[in-house]
Amino acid sequence: MDFLNDHINVFGLIAALVILVLTIYESSSLIKEMRDSKSQGELVENGHLIDGIGEFANNVPVGWIASFMCTIVWAFWYFFFGYPLNSFSQIGQYNEEVKAHNQKFEAKWKHLGQKELVDMGQGIFLVHCSQCHGITAEGLHGSAQNLVRWGKEEGIMDTIKHGSKGMDYLAGEMPAMELDEKDAKAIASYVMAELSSVKKTKNPQLIDKGKELFESMGCTGCHGNDGKGLQENQVFAADLTAYGTENFLRNILTHGKKGNIGHMPSFKYKNFSDLQVKALLNLSNR
């Protein structure tokens, strides 16, 4: 009986019962009248008369007029003061319900370990992401982004090699950079170890060289020396300090991406909780 906890459901149930009772009463009254009453009244002059059945010159029933006027008043209240044009919306109600559910969800699963987070992320990925990225997250032979590299140094190297677009930054599209694999790896190591909040790299010996290349190849022109991508307090380019973090992943899930391969739609309507985003990130970083 959980549906009775919603006042709209209760109102609808009461209204349905009232309508049912009135329908039964009115139907029984009409049936009785049809059985016992006799036709009487003055026929309309020049009115319809077919097989002896004519049209009486009776006034419109008061009850019908009252019902009609009440319907007009109710419709005016409903549209302008009650729901649609005032405050209520189905999308808003849905978002509130999802928000409440997410709070219960996070409270229930807030103490998950690493393995459980990966398992949760795997379930979310298979339902929402695998159709394009494949069940192995490798991108279905190039038809979508390879997420096995995402959030890691390999992902940065891939961006350096192919460029990036579709995030609608003021800087515009990032062009591909003509660097060999060793130099790209050095920049990726520097970004992961010094700029990103991840603060670790598989190639610490390349950090210094990566910093030199980051500055000399013009990366600071868009991303800034600190990698935050801000110019005059405006978001000019991608924030590299968030790369490989929950904020970076949520930004893509929220806005989608029109990349070199195809168009990833926004998943904002899914209202993923912070825990679900964390689970997806743990799956990606495993």
UniProtKB/Swiss-Prot annotation:
Keywords: Cell inner membrane, Cell membrane, Electron transport, Heme, Hydrogen ion transport, Ion transport, Iron, Membrane, Metal-binding, Oxidoreductase, Repeat, Respiratory chain, Transmembrane, Transmembrane helix, Transport. Heme c 2 binds at residues 174, 219, 222-223. It holds the Pfam family FixP_N. It is found in: Cell inner membrane. Signal peptide: none annotated. One of its GO terms (molecular function) is heme binding. Disulfide bonds: none annotated. Binds 2 heme C groups per subunit. It comes from the Bacteria. Residues 116-195, 205-286 form the Cytochrome c domain. Heme c 1 binds at residues 129, 132-133, 264. GO terms for biological process: oxidative phosphorylation. Its cofactor is heme c. The keyword Transmembrane helix applies. Belongs to the CcoP / FixP family. Component of the cbb3-type cytochrome c oxidase at least composed of CcoN, CcoO, CcoQ and CcoP. This is Cbb3-type cytochrome c oxidase subunit CcoP. It comes from Helicobacter pylori (strain ATCC 700392 / 26695) (Campylobacter pylori). The gene is ccoP.
